[in-house]
Amino acid sequence: APRQVIFETASNLRNVKKGKTVSFSKKAFFNIINLCRDTCSYCTYKAEPTNAKLSLMNKQTVRDLAKMAKKYNCTEALFVTGEKPEQKYSEAREWLKKEGFSSTAEYLIHCSEIVLNEGVFPHTNAGNLTRNEMKELQKTNVSLGVMLENSSARLREKGMPHQDAPSKEPVARLNVLRNAGELKIPMTTGLLVGIGESLEECIQSILDI
């Protein structure tokens, strides 16, 4: 079957080019803020302001977790946030203001300095960062991340999983990856499968990456 041929070809290419060694970086997970302006139909990460799972990590909490990460020999601090929550939630804006910042990206830049000073390398995954935000984070982060998920605009149509997720516009995500390449920032990315995509769309997304 054509699908099996594709899988076998991809596997062979990986083995030839990359080998079979799997490396990893021991990390601590920093759920900085899980409010998010997007609503993806499959998401279990996002919280609403009244949810019990809401996470708002202040500077001291970030510092304390970084110290614990160092104690347990973690190399990396994985910063994860929702997509620009301050654009949708007054609660996010008020919280950021209380911490002394006007945007999530600005706060992440500061938190990156905190964990680096504790001896842990920050890696930030915060959605569609601007080029200038990426340049600032580049000063402290060993790498950045943004999931392409899929480069098909069809998944943004009515009734599809990214209908209410403006940041998942493929052009915007690809632009982040392009900026990372131009700025020489190591980047993690990938596809999300099982959200209504076709095999052809998966293949095209890999080629786009």
Model-derived features: positions:
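Short secondary-structure capping/turn segments at boundaries of alpha-helices and beta-strands
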Residues: 11-13, 28-31, 133
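Short, solvent-exposed polar/charged micro-motifs at secondary-structure junctions
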Residues: 4-5, 32-36, 134-135
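Conserved Radical SAM active-site core
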Residues: 49-209
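Conserved acidic
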Residues: 2, 28, 32, 107
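Canonical Radical SAM [4Fe-4S] cluster-binding loop centered on the CxxxCxxC motif
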Residues: 22-61, 84
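An N-cap/entry alpha-helix motif that binds or orients negatively charged groups
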Residues: 1-23
